Amino acid sequence: MKPAARRRARECAVQALYSWQLSKNDIADVELQFLSEQDVKDVDIAYFRELLSGVAVNAASLDALMAPVLSRQLEELGQVERAVLRIALFELSKRDDVPYKVAINEAIELAKTFGAADSHKFVNGVLDKVAPTVRKRK
């Protein structure tokens, strides 16, 4: 699959995870609703599904990875930033085929696209501290 299709999968995953985090609905229901309502042309659907289910199943452990380095309580973290960080930490911890730098750079780009003005700086700072403990640089 092309890198652009993976990027689109990540973009869609941020949006779907944002909805899931706010609604607390079952992730499978969120996925079905998202896929039926959104334009998913040029999206790596299999990767989108893997990100959604992987983050949902591992949310507590992903949050535990980031919590020690956050400058505020996890509950105070913006929903976009939380979704972006969870995706990056899922990729770093569970997807060895995704290079270290790619996971971080993609997270920064997602934060620039969906987050507040300085979200990308915050995401970069958190991942710079957490990523080396999750996976050796590749």
Curated annotation (Swiss-Prot):
Q: Which GO terms describe its biological process?
A: DNA-templated transcription termination; transcription antitermination
Report whether Electron transport shows up as a keyword of the record. Answer: no
> Which UniProt key words apply to this protein?
RNA-binding, Transcription, Transcription antitermination, Transcription regulation
Gene3D superfamilies from the xrefs?
Answer: NusB-like
Q: What does the record give under GO molecular function? A: RNA binding
Q: Which InterPro entries match?
A: NusB-like_sf, NusB_fam, NusB_RsmB_TIM44
Q: Which GO terms describe its cellular component?
A: cytosol
The entry's function note states: Involved in transcription antitermination. Required for transcription of ribosomal RNA (rRNA) genes. Binds specifically to the boxA antiterminator sequence of the ribosomal RNA (rrn) operons.
- Family to which this protein belongs: Belongs to the NusB family.
The protein depicted here goes by the name: Transcription antitermination protein NusB
